[in-house]
Each structure stands twice: as C-alpha cells, then as structure tokens.
Regions:
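Non-catalytic, hydrophobic alpha-helical segments
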Residues: 12, 72, 186, 190, ...
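Substrate-binding strand-loop-helix patch
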Residues: 177-184, 206-224, 236-245, 296
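Glycine/proline-rich active-site loop of Rossmann-fold NAD(P)-dependent oxidoreductases
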Residues: 153-161, 193-204, 228-230
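NAD(P)H-binding glycine-rich loop region in Rossmannoid oxidoreductase-like domains
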Residues: 35-104, 116-118
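N-terminal Rossmann NAD(P)H-binding glycine-rich loop of SDR-like oxidoreductase domains
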Residues: 3-25, 29
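A hydrophobic C-terminal alpha-helical subdomain
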Residues: 238-325
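Substrate-positioning beta->alpha
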Residues: 93, 173-194, 202, 214
C-alpha cells in the first residue's frame, strides 16, 4: 500500500511512519522542514515531501510530487488548546488533507483523533469532532482512531518526585482513571486497522494492555520507584474554576485572557474526566468498556523512564508539571 502521512514529525506520527515502513508499505511523509537526525531515524525508508503549510494551495502544489496514494493518514494536532489554533489545525488543515486525498485517488483516510472527543466540551474537542463528522459524511472510506491517554501525558511529574517534591493531585479522592497506551502500541493498532477493511468506516477507541490507573495510583508507582514514602499535595478544584472564571471575564476584551480561560477549562476537564470509553448502557466512563491492545504497560514505561530519563517524552502539555530549573 502507498500511504501519505501528515503529522509525521509528531510524537505519534513518527512511530506510525516507522511501523508502516516496517510492514513493507511505501510511505510518503509531509514535512514543513528537513528532519533532524532524531526524526530522520524514525522516517528512514519513507520519502519526504516538503510543504510550507497544510493549506489547500500548498497541498495542491505538492500533489504532483506526492503522486497517487492508496491511503492518507492524518496525525496532525494543534500544539496547544487555543481555540483559534485548534480550528485552524484540527479542523481546517484536516479538511484540506481530505480534499488532497480525493485529488490523489486515495481509497482510505485514517484520522488520529482522541478519546476525549466522545464528550466534546472544549474548543479543541469541538474542532476535532466537527472534522470527525465531516470525514464520516465524506464519500471516501475512513477510520477514526480515538486513543485514551499517552504514556508521555502521564510523565510530567516524574522529575518532581526525583527532586523530592510531592505528587500533585486535583480535588479529593484518587482522581480520574485512564487506560494509557504507548506510542508504539498505538502505531501498531493504526497500521492494523489500515490493513483490515473490516474495521473501516468506524470510530475505534483503544487503550493499552494494562489496568485502569488513577493519578493517586500513578503517584504511588513513582514513589515506589524512588524508594521514598508517598507525599501528595492537593490542588482544590474550586481554585481551577475560579481562575477560569476570572480569565473568562477578562477574555471579553483580551485574547490572551480568553486563551488562559480555555487552558483553565482544559485543566479542569482532565482533572475530573476519566479517559475511559463510555459504557453503552449507562453512558458512564467504564474501564470494562474500554478496548485494549498492545504489550507495553505504564509500569514498564515508568521504570524505564526512571532509569534513563524522559528521552523523547518532553512534549506538549505534559510539561505542565515538569520541573524547570
């Protein structure tokens, strides 16, 4: 299969490219700039196609260099939760990629989305959901992949524990559970779906093979690795809400404040919402209803990262809790 991958420089996209190449597919990757040595190691065997942006004009100009393809895989995502960026990237750029897929004769369009889109209340979730709907309504075959939580998203407090700081928890109780998945397991799942037309034209959620874990349990795992007694510090959810409300008021006259209010809403969402598939009967998040795949566990990831550091994991919003010198 000849596959075009967008978002190949990202955390998941690079692993998707490596997995597709490993399986013998011909892979073309859209890049804004030539890859550095680290990225190039993941893209070995793929053919790069440089384009300054993923807008319609730039993609149309690149179509001749790309050539015909059997499938397009989109791993693009906004790098922040800013509403304007989310709609520009998660919606508009994906729409441009969908039009390019038709131009290139692709039979299939695979979208890397996110499980949180099952209840879209934030701007970036609504942008993703709007494109999911557009893709489902398009004439091309499709698959929409909704992973739970990435290991790297749960790595932000490792350095806090290493530097004798308490593990931060929001609100009371153990916190919302998730069934996280590694980048390699997710890449394998996406490649499996791409090769199996029985799984096309569906929205497929997946987590990793391990059990559902809460923030409190993740903290206990890290303190055990450190050989230290557990120490937790709780941040009141009322504080997050009040910050968001204050910024929302100021956001009527300030774009920066409006973005800050959205970040507060994002923090509140992830502090309270389990990343689990909703049970079809009750509608409530359910570990039992969450599909699983792969081999990598969070415990193994934490143990390896504790020994070797966060190589390749210091990405995006996971930096929220990272220690800065």
């Amino acid at each position: 299969m000849r596959v075009l991958v967008a978002g190949a420089s990202g955390y998941i996209g690079r692993h998707v490219v490596a997995e597709l190449v490993r399986r013998g597919h011909q892979v073309v990757v859209l890049l804004r700039r030539a890859p550095d040595a680290n990225l190039a190691s993941f893209l070995d065997g793929a053919r790069p196609c440089l384009t300054p942006t993923l807008g319609d004009a730039a993609l149309a100009a690149s179509a001749g260099r790309i050539g015909s393809v059997d499938a397009v895989v989109s791993c693009i995502a906004a790098s922040s939760g800013r509403p304007a960026e989310a709609w520009a990237v998660d919606h508009d750029m994906n729409q441009a990629l969908l039009r390019l897929a038709t131009r290139l004769g692709a039979r299939h369009f695979q979208l890397l989305s996110a499980l949180c889109v099952q209840r879209p209340v934030l701007a970036f979730q609504r942008a993703k959901h709007a494109f999911e709907q557009a893709l489902a309504d398009a004439s091309i075959d499709h698959s929409i992949i909704r992973p739970t939580a990435f290991f790297k998203s749960l790595a932000g407090q490792i350095e806090r524990i290493r530097h004798n700081k308490p593990f931060l928890l929001f609100g009371q109780g153990p916190g919302p559970a998730c069934v996280p998945i590694s980048e390699t397991d997710l890449a394998g799942f996406m490649a499996d779906v791409l090769a199996d037309d029985r799984r096309w034209n569906r929205t497929l959620a997946t987590g990793g093979p391990g059990p559902a874990v809460t923030p409190h349990e993740r903290g206990e795992m890290l303190f055990a690795l450190a050989g230290k007694p557990s120490r937790f510090r709780r941040i009141p959810l009322s504080l997050v809400r009040s910050v968001g409300c204050g910024l929302a008021g100021a956001g009527r006259v300030s774009r920066r404040a409006a973005d800050g209010a959205e970040f507060a809403r994002i923090a509140y969402f992830y502090a309270t919402e389990p990343m689990l598939v909703a049970d079809p009967k009750s509608g409530q998040p359910s570990a039992a209803a969450t599909p699983r795949c792969g081999r990598d566990t969070l415990a193994e990831f934490y143990a390896r990262t504790w020994r070797k550091g966060l190589d390749g994991q210091r990405l995006g919003d996971a930096a929220l809790f990272e220690r800065r010198s």
